[in-house]
Amino acid sequence: MADWARAQSPGAVEEILDRENKRMADNLASKVTRLKSLALDIDKDAEDQNRYLDGMDSDFTSMTGLLTGSVKRFSTMARSGRDNRKLLCGMAVGLIVAFFILSYFLSRART
């Protein structure tokens, strides 16, 4: 950068400044290329994540429908009378026991 101060003729100063300008333009072009590549990578990643989130949204929507139906059936069964309350309690205890047994076997399978 200080080479232009040592130049003897005005033509040499212009040549040195021109070379420095080209070098800086090349550096700028390489930085712009890297930024463009980075922006494209971010865009691709954002699109992938949006697709993933859309898939999760449809999964949660279907799960919500399934759980809503189960809760309605469970509520109907709970309101149906005293005879079914023993059955309901037995089913609840059975589901809890099944959950703990399943979690025990899954934890043993991982270790």
Swiss-Prot record:
SUPFAM superfamilies: SNARE fusion complex. InterPro entries: BET1_SNARE (IPR039899), T_SNARE_dom (IPR000727). PROSITE patterns: T_SNARE. GO terms for cellular component: Golgi membrane. The modification Phosphoserine is found at residues 9, 37. The chain crosses the membrane at residues 87-107. Keywords: Coiled coil, Golgi apparatus, Membrane, Phosphoprotein, Protein transport, Transmembrane, Transmembrane helix, Transport. Residues 15-77 form the t-SNARE coiled-coil homology domain. It is found in: Golgi apparatus membrane; Golgi apparatus, trans-Golgi network membrane. Gene3D superfamilies: 1.20.5.110. It comes from the Eukaryota. Residues 1-86 are cytoplasmic. GO terms for biological process: protein transport. The keyword Protein transport applies. Residues 108-111 are lumenal. The keyword Phosphoprotein applies. Vesicle SNARE required for targeting and fusion of retrograde transport vesicles with the Golgi complex. Required for the integrity of the Golgi complex. Component of a SNARE complex consisting of STX5, YKT6, GOSR1 and BET1L. Interacts with STX5. This is BET1-like protein. The lineage of its organism: Eukaryota, Metazoa, Chordata, Craniata, Vertebrata. The gene is BET1L.
